Swiss-Prot record:
Seems to stimulates transcription by the viral polymerase. May play a role in viral pathogenesis or transmission by insects vectors. This is Protein C'. The P gene has two overlapping open reading frames. One encodes the P protein and the other the C'/C proteins. Belongs to the rhabdoviruses C protein family. It comes from the Viruses.
Length: 67
């Protein structure tokens, strides 16, 4: 049990393990960021469309009030 503990404490091991994890996780993190960005962009487009429709409806409402 003690030898495993010492292995984990070894700076060379931890550094190589970290590099291994980074090389594995980096593409996954990048992919997740891309997906999140696409989702946010889609939501932003939806919000813009809704705001445009609300503006149109307010103009129509103002026109009907004027009649």
């Amino acid at each position: 049990m003690r030898s495993k503990h010492n292995e984990l404490k070894s700076p060379i091991m931890s550094c190589s393990k970290r590099m291994e994890w980074k090389s594995i996780l980096s593409p996954l993190i990048f992919r997740q960021q891309m997906i999140l960005t696409q989702n946010l962009n889609q939501k932003l487009k939806t919000i813009k469309v809704c705001m445009h429709r609300i503006q149109k409806l307010s103009k129509l409402k103002a026109l009907y009030r004027g009649l």
